[in-house]
Swiss-Prot record:
This is Zinc transporter 9. It holds the Pfam family Zip. GO terms for molecular function: zinc ion transmembrane transporter activity. It comes from Oryza sativa subsp. japonica. PANTHER family: ZINC TRANSPORTER 9, ZINC/IRON TRANSPORTER. One of its GO terms (biological process) is zinc ion transmembrane transport.
Amino acid sequence: MAFDLKLTACLLLAVFSLAAAADCECQPSDEGHDAAKSRTLKVIAIFCILVGSSAGCAIPSLGRRFPALRPDTSLFFALKAFAAGVILATAFVHILPVSFDKLGSPCLVDGPWRKYPFTGLVAMLAAVATLLLDTIATGYFLQRAQDSRGAVAAVAACGGDASSSHDHERGNAHGVSSAVIASATMPNDAADDCDDAEDRAKLVRHRVISQVFELGIIVHSIIIGISLGASESPSTIRPLVAALTFHQFFEGIGLGGCIVQARFHLKSAVTMAIFFSLTTPVGIMIGIGISSAYNENSPTALIVEGILDAAAAGILNYMALVDLLAEDFMNPRVRKSGRLQLIISILLLVGIALMSLLGIWA
């Protein structure tokens, strides 16, 4: 289901981009344009961003080989705080101001776009929609997990072979690990049942978080890629290559951390990582394909990109503050350690500072 949502989002963004290319009223200036040099820089950008995204997403998964990077270590908490700071600055410093500029552009008619702060409205609604999706999806998958656990326990209680039931449920639990379902076949006292239920709830929550988080990243990554790919100005593209490579690298660390905590099967984890890594490069290729007809100042392009930027900012704000920072800062291990609180607070501020600094070039 999550993969279908991501694929649908990408297709809709591509269609909107083509529509924007056909509607050109405010014509851009050709000053400083160099198609040949721009094309070379775009190819370099595709390669650099692909490598940066993949490397960032892969770092948290190294915890299987390096114990210091496991989800329960101080280093992992610090990395997540740093990545959350990057994501927060991305939303507030990079995406939200761009949306305000686009929806307030003089190329748009005076009403209603330039008379009402649609950027704030869309960002707020996107954050609320993310909250509702987060809550509903978590509740749904938890219920599925409880139903699956009850079914397996019933088979075990009747003296039957639970393995066939376990195999069947493994393909349908959507967010429940095989270990969690299998644990239902073993006798537990009340305390063990409580701990098991808590672990199961955390697992489901991490899986929902990682999927909603990736959906938010996809929205703004496609737009960024299309904008870069459609540009014919080397002076515009050159600083974006380095800025976007670092941007995608840090976002990859955040997403990779969520994927590791969600304990997806290897195939699902690799699919999510590949999808994230390819999103911006695919956007660049779409931009290259429509660059001859695309006009970033057309009303359609400004409205569509402005609304999607605002929605992406709202989603990322919610994910960074609620699902990443609040969850870690409220973690009992963090609350009991003043030293760890200080470390992740500093790393959070460093992430915010570095990503805000990139706003000078991107």
